[in-house]
């Protein structure tokens, strides 16, 4: 028979009483009234906040967007195939946030920063709100450093600065993504961290971009956020904010970042779908009334930070697709009014064989020469004017039968200047190469070379300077100025090379 020791029983009970902690947790619970098309209507969530995350009993997470008198409209993050009417929902007390950090470099993630490239989990010890407030006026300083794209047409005539927001706009299949990916490739060795956000793209297109960046060694400083065409509208809507949050981590740590949103038209369409399903009143083109705020709060997060905050920067290159070149549609006009300029890509120019197909007449940078080094300002000043005059003369010359010699010379010069702006995809040029190329065209050294030989001569010139005259590149990179020494060196190099080139052509 077991003997009961009262002292021991008392001691055990006392220990258990000491350990016991009474926790009273109040959970705000509701019931699903209706679910479908990525939207759930919930009854009973009386204390829910706007934008708060809610958790359904089968594990799906949603965001409470519509707070109405008798129900709450929530958008679902994911498929939620097992979610049914009558299921219980509880509030989490949290706003959507994601992990951020250096571990994301070289990875492909979704809108919730979960890896989708099959390379395992990402170690991260910091989180950021997906929707963070933009830096205030005092936190910023004016844009004054160039962000080189490697494309002559942009760096010379529509310069982009670190902290600027420059819209890339054009019809489908005019090379918008190519301009963006070339800009990423050109940041190699520049200390700029790039974030490419693919919204509603084909999975094959995103895969192609990843392959290009990996081949060129650009993935080591790039993060890709991808929500493909088959993703839910909620995740497509969140993807750009996730990209901005990932870039902000680096910006507030004193780094320079570049974010590409490809493209915001698809994000607006996803938001329109969500809003219509939530029964919000439609406005112009059936978009909701706050579609301007959708993009403004995203693009205002791009900034050049003040010295006190570490001088970091976030440059935004949003992409918007137009229909038949119509820039007066709702979304294009909204984004044009938010950004600091636009690069307009034309289908007609693209089809005429000029790539990148930038319409220099309509494109503009509101930062201007503040985002150029002195060397570029010195040579590129006349380029835009000469091209504008050429475009006018070219249109006029189609109607005129006999043109005087001066007009013919100007037309010949303009055709060669347009030729030097052509660049194959994925071959960005350094600043020194661009300065040499523009100087050659502006000063008439290409005038007596046949039009079809211009690109061949320029390629040869750039190779010759890089291999035989490294001093030129050193001067430009060190002083950022097109000095007299650099000009003389370049002039004699062009003259010598031209003689040999002409002999070979003959």
Curated annotation (Swiss-Prot):
Gene from which the chain derives: atpA
Protein name: ATP synthase subunit alpha, chloroplastic
Gene3D superfamilies: 2.40.30.20, ATP synthase alpha/beta chain, C-terminal domain, P-loop containing nucleotide triphosphate hydrolases
Family, similarity comment: Belongs to the ATPase alpha/beta chains family.
PROSITE patterns to which the protein is assigned, alphabetical: ATPASE_ALPHA_BETA
GO cellular component terms given for this protein: chloroplast thylakoid membrane; proton-transporting ATP synthase complex
Record-linked InterPro entries: ATP_synth_asu-like_sf (IPR023366), ATP_synth_asu_C (IPR000793), ATP_synth_asu_C_sf (IPR038376), ATP_synth_F1_a_nt-bd_dom (IPR033732), ATP_synth_F1_asu (IPR005294), ATPase_a/bsu_AS (IPR020003), ATPase_F1/V1/A1_a/bsu_N (IPR004100), ATPase_F1/V1/A1_a/bsu_N_sf (IPR036121)
Membrane topology of this protein: Peripheral membrane protein
Keyword terms, alphabetized: ATP synthesis, ATP-binding, CF(1), Chloroplast, Hydrogen ion transport, Ion transport, Membrane, Nucleotide-binding, Plastid, Thylakoid, Translocase, Transport
